[in-house]
Amino acid sequence: MQKIFLLILLVILFPSISLSEDFRFLKIASFSKPWGSSFINNNELIITEKTGKIKIVNINNGKIFEVEHNLKFENIGQGGLLDIVFKNNYLWVSYTEVIKPFNYSTSIARGVFNRKKIKFKNIFQQNSISGSTQHFGSRLVIQDNYLFASIGERGGGMIAQNSKLHPGSIIRIHLDGSIPKDNPKFINEPNWLKEIYQIGLRNPQG
């Protein structure tokens, strides 16, 4: 039976004359395998479900709206629709993309935010595809107008030590997918891919 996860709002009450804290959990809404979320304003979260849906939830009244999209994702193993980030009316989403039958990539797409339908376009695609259905990553973080993304090693172990391949790395790119000129340069590593910020990781999701 498919597991249903609950989105829970943590409300922290700060007593005015005491250092003690009371915690109260409020059930806001139910989702099917939620994976990523990002605030689009003070009252609404946009949420990905691993199974492929993108939804907006109002945290005040619990109302949920589904948003159509054009992503050709694959819900398989640990893969599916993964993380999502909102900034300046744009959305970035990581997902499991089918490159050819039984071969998958961790890919990242960007689209202009729209409440009814979002048209995404890829800005990153993993360069070493695999038939593995595990360890896709993938957490997205925007900082100082750079997009950081963790790419899982797909169960490949030592592939994460290869600076010419994306699995097992963190990439750092501009918000449009281009590669920053100030990305780190590594001595004695002339073939280190310019978008790779760090190697040697397993399946970072935090």
Which residue ranges define each predicted feature?
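Blade/loop signatures of beta-propeller domains
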Residues: 18-23, 178-189
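Acidic, Gly/Ser/Thr-rich repeat motifs that build Ca2+-stabilized beta-propeller blades
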Residues: 19-158, 206
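Beta-propeller blade signature
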Residues: 105-115, 163-176
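Secondary-structure boundary elements
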Residues: 116, 142-148, 173-185
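Short, well-ordered junction/capping motifs at the entry into regular secondary structure
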Residues: 155, 187-193
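Repeat-solenoid scaffold signature
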Residues: 192-206
